[in-house]
């Protein structure tokens, strides 16, 4: 399904790339315009060039675009120069709350200061230079500085090696948490000269390509990252172990089991030849963090890290740095057994059965003993606070989703109500004061007393209280806030964990802010969990309290290391008489002996032994297969396979599909387990079933491993095991934009139809007549006489078309081809020829040589009659009297004896000036020839009197004429004929401003023998013959393709009337006036049919392909590039009408011009036109649309099917008519199979609901089978193939309906409203309305939940809608499977009915159209899209037309994937920007920000701020804001 908010993919994206330049052609147009405007009309030419000037009147729009493009390019360059976040100087003046995490770290100046290593650090440093070493030092003793020393040494050696031409190598500093990545990177940056990068998973590193990583490796010599990132880089062969010079493991004691530290060693380090392995340096406060044999565990760690444990031999030096605190034991009396408080009892009685509260009950129960009554009760207040309730409700829903009972939704709803009830009970509960006796446990009482001793007075004490549980830390912090010890300022520092309930969510940023406050003294008592023990740079404090005793040596050493001040105290809280607590103290003493043992090791003593060899390290993975790509070295393992598949799945998530993840179905079989891997719907490989294994986990990993191999075999994973789709899929989806939509090339253009050139060479003996009548919409100044157009071949019946006479009176031109021929004598041919040439001379100031053998057509007067039938004899219609009179009289001679009134209602012309043509109106008795003309008349060179005003002779001829002319002749009122030739369009303002009233004398002029009414009609002939030419050329184009298309549709399909016709709502540039409808609506219709036709063809001709293959193959067929190539091959560009009326080319060709301006040279230049490749492709789609509306011999789609085959020019679409599709379809086995009982039952139920009986119920079963349903259980294929087909069928039936109902709406409107009809949102609602959702077969708990919740919501919305049909627009989006199954059902019905489209139309009429009878209610549906909404607000609310939305690609910044910058520019001011990984989402962000800006200002402020005068200028046209894509 296309996204509901996605604009048509064919619309130009207007994406700027950094290396593009402004089009020089546009600049040249501006220059030409300026030059022409400076030229003066000398008055001597026979015709003016007003039309050309008019063509350039829109150049201001082009200039605006140039300015906007330049503005955006400058902005793009500026943004592309932005450096990475750690290179930007930190704004120290901003409060911490406004700073990013990276800036918070930088602001604290971690690691700043001189590097001053102590002797013990130098000792370990020297050891680490020559051998792999694990440094065991107390927390706070400066292990990181040893690492810095080692890095400096390693980097110095690396720089020397690089200078000698050796391969580049990189240092890696590995950490175990995101927080440490920030901290250690800050330390290294402040102590190393070389660039340091730091990365962690939340940055999206798993989706980075090798090229991105190569940029980072090139840029940085040291990389700090979490261990899993390096592990994946090594497995994907983004980097090889031999390219690393040192591996530093922070908190190296984590190297065990399947920790990424251990996997890096096992899977990559030990696989490398010994000589190419990097140096290893591990750091830890204790080499072990578990209970057990200390020496054995230490030895195992050495083996895993291929290193030697070492520590300082001079403890006095260490003591100076890492001061040991005074260790104290704070004893407390034996705790009570856990008990139920009154609040606990009350809640347990009412809500004790609720699973979502189980953890809180458990904590409150234990807290009653460990913390006391008050703390136990306060846990409920925190757990059921208002901000936590939504999370608990979500937990209830999640639990309900995992059930299969049909009453789950109701029970879940009740559970949520019970949670709310519990919250209200807690809110109304009267909590006792913690000061009350018995409210606090003995343990908390001791802590309170001791802290009161430290903080009861002004003090510099800083304290950390360590707890085992996060909730304990939170409750204790709340308690001590309440107790109000005078100088105690409590705070909390707990770890980051996703999915927490009870308000315990905390971010890395909040951790840093707590540390910053602790450092500055704003907090002086931190209640912390283990997150404060390990590695974090917590400033020295003088009191550390173990509220909960440590569990391991490492916890003890690390927490003790936090007490670094001189005379600091480390207090352990121990229960009196608790043997376990006492035993733990003894264990720590034994572990301390281990550290002493480490320190006494001789320098050459190795703890390698023979009982821990490499075989034991690798033994765990024995039997697990691996696969290595030789070219890159990338390695596939059982562990990495699942991660690779997860990455592959996420690369397919281009829309909001919930299921862009891998599904693993593990089933028992013959005492073993087999796993089926099901990949997301968009994957071309659906998955596979793995080999049997004895464990579920091994079966899952084995199947994932085999799936990776299958994807690799099908070239869906690259040489680094990355999905190819982060590059390929967008390119395929954007195939419609894979050609240039802006750049144009010159192509040949036919300016005259070939029909005019046929049968020439001799005078005609017979001609075919076409009767031309004028039907004005209102009274005209002159009654137009009908005309006859005679041609050598019979003309087709042309559609009626309008022209605009007088003051834009719309007049319909009706052409009627006569059936009978006109047989002619030589004299009659001569009469026709003379009349036609006389029209050219008298009316248009062109005198041609009389050559009837070269003439293409003849014009003749017709007898005036209301109408003529085609069967009439042309000889009876022709006005022979007028024809003979014109032949015998060159003009009507002037006579002084004539009655003055006899000169009225004649056509008069100046023989020497083509601009002067008049219709006489009446005698003006108030003027004489010597009178000055009235001041309002049009200006001419001589204005001294009427006689001179009419005279165009040269100086000498003028004097001679004036000396002999008759100064007593009458002066006539006359109407000056405008120089307007393009009557196909209304007048321009310039043409309208021409003054047509004038006064003339007859003697200086010539009176035409052509009757005035006929001359008036002949003035329209250039427009009429131009339109006839266009019809004939379009017909010729269709005939060249062997299409039978209606003439009006053919011309519409070939008509491009502006430079940017395809930008429907944009202000059109260089508009060609009077061309009629352009191709855009037909292109919209044809595009839809093309999609449907190719979908059907692929479905029928490729039964074994899956949906992905169909999508890719269809895109290759319908993409603009393919259409363009086919069009060029068939020379379709010749027939495209890209120019409107031309006063240069409407004249007949081949005649010899004797007098008048020769336009032949200009006509030659107009035989070429500039077309964009996309325009040519769009015309192909328009031709398909025209063929569709023209029908066919057997089926109304026949001609359109033939057009598709011709224009896609591919073996994948071979049908010549509609019924060919059926003949190509081979019924698959599953469809022919006899239906079982369940399938028959489903068929009957659907027939009851939708009134269609399936001949093949198995088709219906396939339509309702979700891709998640395991193939082992399914008897039919999933619905994807049918959904692909049905999607195009629904598109077609909806578009046809809108196209027919709204003939005057532009494609943008049609697209926006089609979006509502075919949107996932509507089709999902329709699925529930029709009750289809209950029949879907799937295997997914989240899917069940989503369907249930959505069905309840949409049914509730319908019930509350009071009959409103648009109730579905206000609900959340449905699960994608629901619209998919509707589309699949439509596809199944289509196939089952033998491709009967009428069945689809019936489904549309019965179930879809009732929702869309009134399309006005969906006007805002598309407008909710930010880009459309912004367009509407700027144009309608603010009246602005000078704005645009530009988007352009930016180079990669700080190694991130290449981004796209979008900007909204209003009157050359950038008002909003947005960046994203695609143009679509960048435009959305920019539009949203721009809307926020507009929300803050009024219309008056807008005009003042942006100097917008669009409303005042009255320019109602609209500029291109760009599209949503």
From Swiss-Prot:
<dbReference type="InterPro" id="IPR036389">
    <property type="entry name" value="RNase_III_sf"/>
</dbReference>
<feature type="binding site">
    <location>
        <position position="1508"/>
    </location>
    <ligand>
        <name>Zn(2+)</name>
    </ligand>
</feature>
<dbReference type="GO" id="GO:0005737">
    <property type="term" value="C:cytoplasm"/>
</dbReference>
<feature type="binding site">
    <location>
        <position position="1510"/>
    </location>
    <ligand>
        <name>Zn(2+)</name>
    </ligand>
</feature>
<feature type="binding site">
    <location>
        <begin position="137"/>
        <end position="144"/>
    </location>
    <ligand>
        <name>ATP</name>
    </ligand>
</feature>
<protein>
    <recommendedName>
        <fullName>Dicer-like protein 1</fullName>
        <ecNumber>3.1.26.-</ecNumber>
        <ecNumber>3.6.4.-</ecNumber>
    </recommendedName>
</protein>
<feature type="region of interest" description="Disordered">
    <location>
        <begin position="37"/>
        <end position="65"/>
    </location>
</feature>
<dbReference type="InterPro" id="IPR005034">
    <property type="entry name" value="Dicer_dimerisation_dom"/>
</dbReference>
<feature type="domain" description="RNase III 2">
    <location>
        <begin position="1243"/>
        <end position="1394"/>
    </location>
</feature>
<dbReference type="GO" id="GO:0030422">
    <property type="term" value="P:siRNA processing"/>
</dbReference>
<dbReference type="InterPro" id="IPR000999">
    <property type="entry name" value="RNase_III_dom"/>
</dbReference>
<dbReference type="InterPro" id="IPR006935">
    <property type="entry name" value="Helicase/UvrB_N"/>
</dbReference>
<keyword id="KW-0862">Zinc</keyword>
<comment type="similarity">
    <text>Belongs to the helicase family. Dicer subfamily.</text>
</comment>
<feature type="site" description="Important for activity">
    <location>
        <position position="1376"/>
    </location>
</feature>
<dbReference type="GO" id="GO:0005634">
    <property type="term" value="C:nucleus"/>
</dbReference>
<feature type="compositionally biased region" description="Acidic residues">
    <location>
        <begin position="37"/>
        <end position="52"/>
    </location>
</feature>
<dbReference type="GO" id="GO:0051607">
    <property type="term" value="P:defense response to virus"/>
</dbReference>
<dbReference type="GO" id="GO:0005524">
    <property type="term" value="F:ATP binding"/>
</dbReference>
<feature type="domain" description="DRBM">
    <location>
        <begin position="1428"/>
        <end position="1496"/>
    </location>
</feature>
<dbReference type="InterPro" id="IPR014001">
    <property type="entry name" value="Helicase_ATP-bd"/>
</dbReference>
<dbReference type="InterPro" id="IPR038248">
    <property type="entry name" value="Dicer_dimer_sf"/>
</dbReference>
<feature type="binding site">
    <location>
        <position position="1467"/>
    </location>
    <ligand>
        <name>Zn(2+)</name>
    </ligand>
</feature>
<dbReference type="InterPro" id="IPR001650">
    <property type="entry name" value="Helicase_C-like"/>
</dbReference>
<dbReference type="Pfam" id="PF24995">
    <property type="entry name" value="DSRM_2"/>
</dbReference>
<feature type="domain" description="Helicase C-terminal">
    <location>
        <begin position="439"/>
        <end position="605"/>
    </location>
</feature>
<feature type="domain" description="Helicase ATP-binding">
    <location>
        <begin position="124"/>
        <end position="305"/>
    </location>
</feature>
<keyword id="KW-0464">Manganese</keyword>
<dbReference type="Pfam" id="PF00271">
    <property type="entry name" value="Helicase_C"/>
</dbReference>
<dbReference type="GO" id="GO:0046872">
    <property type="term" value="F:metal ion binding"/>
</dbReference>
<comment type="function">
    <text>Dicer-like endonuclease involved in cleaving double-stranded RNA in the RNA interference (RNAi) pathway. Produces 21 to 25 bp dsRNAs (siRNAs) which target the selective destruction of homologous RNAs leading to sequence-specific suppression of gene expression, called post-transcriptional gene silencing (PTGS). Part of a broad host defense response against viral infection and transposons.</text>
</comment>
<dbReference type="InterPro" id="IPR027417">
    <property type="entry name" value="P-loop_NTPase"/>
</dbReference>
<keyword id="KW-0547">Nucleotide-binding</keyword>
<dbReference type="Pfam" id="PF00636">
    <property type="entry name" value="Ribonuclease_3"/>
</dbReference>
<feature type="binding site">
    <location>
        <position position="1283"/>
    </location>
    <ligand>
        <name>Mg(2+)</name>
    </ligand>
</feature>
<keyword id="KW-0378">Hydrolase</keyword>
<dbReference type="GO" id="GO:0004386">
    <property type="term" value="F:helicase activity"/>
</dbReference>
<feature type="short sequence motif" description="DEAH box">
    <location>
        <begin position="250"/>
        <end position="253"/>
    </location>
</feature>
<keyword id="KW-0694">RNA-binding</keyword>
<keyword id="KW-0677">Repeat</keyword>
<dbReference type="Pfam" id="PF04851">
    <property type="entry name" value="ResIII"/>
</dbReference>
<dbReference type="GO" id="GO:0003677">
    <property type="term" value="F:DNA binding"/>
</dbReference>
